[in-house]
């Protein structure tokens, strides 16, 4: 239970203004530049007017304005960093893009939604580049990614190496069960008709089974897309004999 009338925290006009200003500030620092770069990069063949219309449409996205900004989730920062990664990938700056995506993952674990596609794209590019160039590119990406994660987790590691487990548990909150944070949409929706926890057993082994099952089905769902991306890298390589080295 919770105290409905006394657990709301500070709700002064000044605190609300401060929180809203932080959202606007982070949007101006991360999200808006990412959108501007996106329209200029991905819509470069189109007219300037079309680019401006696309930018305005993206800036007025109702989901961010009405929901995320309303309760200060700062999802625009995560989305902005992911979009910056895609922008840099599109311009051939894969290493900078990898750093941006690591920052996105570090900011909010929801960026894991995009990890299979981004990882598959980069691996497909390494395949396309050929054994020698592709392996060198893969190595550079690996070093940059590991170094970026190491710097992110360093503040947790320095006081005590055991502290590093806490952010990892927050990124992968399996210990909280399948219905953590209402992000398991299929399971929450289907639970109206099929009581999954009752079916699996409302105990530790039952919760563990649900987590393993959902993870396996999630992987099964995105594996076809991963294979398509990897195959595209291989077929493009076969069509380009100049990348055989």
Locate predicted features.
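Membrane-interfacial catalytic/cofactor-binding modules of polytopic membrane enzymes
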Residues: 1, 5-23, 61-72, 76-81, ...
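Transmembrane alpha-helical segments
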Residues: 30-38, 81-89, 116-123, 147, ...
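Transmembrane-helix signature of polytopic, membrane-embedded enzymes
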Residues: 2-9, 29, 34-62, 239
